[in-house]
């Protein structure tokens, strides 16, 4: 395939008997036509206590995937991935990345420029160093609450797959709002300690929490289905 293709992020609630097999064996490119990559994780509520039902929601599943084109997504949802059609997903084009993952090796650092005022989707994916998990939680939970409570984040959540994989997913009203949050500047007068994210990133540079860590930025194309009883998470300015 030439070019980055189309990405999706799916959210669905299923019985544990369905989610556990998907966590162990997500959809595979050799079994799903025009699928390039897929990863399934259990949802977590950002900022939830470490030991709590909200921290590991085995019935609520996220899937991050890369496809050849939108026709491949439709074929998957109409066929082998029909259970995902009962949930919610957003279709996205890749804009840029910071760092890289072995699972997504050939993406360019920047595919397209973005407008500061356009809506944006951010996905992080990391493989944890297990001895660093307590330290990661100490620095990470304040950032989780910052993103969760930010007035410009229309949807924000985290997901995990034992033992090492962790992801965050967020939709923002604008690129500017997201980058201001990342750097702890501007537009956050109503939030306590807006520099939490910048401080955590400085700590990660001092001693990394992860074997691998990458941040991806996407332009939302279209939104499908319902999550938690609602739709419309992608701001209307995205020209949906």
Outline where the language-model segments fall.
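Conserved CoA-thioester-binding segment of acyl-CoA-metabolizing enzymes
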Residues: 81
